[in-house]
Curated annotation (Swiss-Prot):
Lineage: Bacteria, Bacillati, Bacillota, Bacilli, Bacillales
Assigned protein family: Belongs to the class I-like SAM-binding methyltransferase superfamily. TrmB family.
GO cellular component: tRNA methyltransferase complex
Name by which UniProt lists this protein: tRNA (guanine-N(7)-)-methyltransferase
Keyword Metal-binding part of the UniProt annotation: no
Disulfide-bond pairs as recorded: none
Organism: Macrococcus caseolyticus (strain JCSC5402) (Macrococcoides caseolyticum)
UniProt signal peptide: none
Record keywords, A-Z: Methyltransferase, S-adenosyl-L-methionine, Transferase, tRNA processing
């Protein structure tokens, strides 16, 4: 999600370095970043932050990390975390391909990919967050029993992701081509999810593991 540039964004984030990190200095210190040692779930591409903040509030027994490379967008998530005093949520402004520089092998229990950029042009396929290059990153940081939960309104990206994950050897389950047709009570909608669902787009979802 692109927002108007805020020249003061980095200074704002630095003032809240107890919950947000804008560099790669957290390697080997992720566990110490939280108040309690608990399973860690991450969302790659947190956008405006509704999903990750609501998940953290609903599941205090889990530590959450929202990953959003756009510092201007990250401001919104920090504001929500501070205003609502969400203690089991931390935030990182890094690119997804650098996750192995942040997390140790097997350190993460679940990865959420919600409404990622579909990068529709074939020449941009390697930028899709379900491309095999990213799957290798996820495989490294996920626990052996860890899972990826993926949601998108983009049918082409969903089909591509199924093919990419299957070709990589991943096991897929709970494939849903119309999530909102019989929406689970525990489904937390992102801002994008509401937007596209209201426009009549079907929401696709799946779970996968290595």
């Amino acid at each position: 999600m692109r927002m108007r540039n805020k020249p003061w964004a980095e200074d704002f984030l630095l003032q809240h370095d107890d919950i947000v990190s804008i560099d790669l200095a957290r390697k080997d210190h992720i566990v110490d970043w939280f108040d309690q040692v608990q399973p860690i779930h991450i969302e790659v591409g947190s956008g405006m932050g509704r999903f990750i903040t609501e998940m953290a509030k609903a599941h205090p027994e889990i530590n959450y990390i929202g990953i959003e490379r756009d510092k201007n967008v990250m401001i919104r998530i920090v504001e929500k975390a501070v205003e609502q005093n969400i203690r089991n949520l931390r935030l990182l402004t890094v690119d997804a391909e650098k996750l192995t520089e942040i997390f140790n092998e097997g350190e993460i229990d679940r990865i959420y990919l919600n409404f990622s950029d579909p990068w529709p042009k074939a020449r941009h396929a390697k930028r899709r967050l379900t491309h095999e290059n990213f799957l290798k990153v996820y495989e490294t940081i996920l626990d052996k029993d860890g899972e990826i939960h993926f949601k998108t309104d983009n049918q082409a990206l969903f089909e591509y992701s199924i093919e990419s994950m299957s070709h990589y050897g991943m096991k897929l389950k709970n494939i849903n081509l119309n999530l909102h047709d019989n929406e689970p009570e525990d489904n937390i909608r992102t801002e994008y999810e509401d937007k596209f669902s209201n426009k009549g787009f079907r929401i696709n979802r799946l779970e996968a593991r290595f």
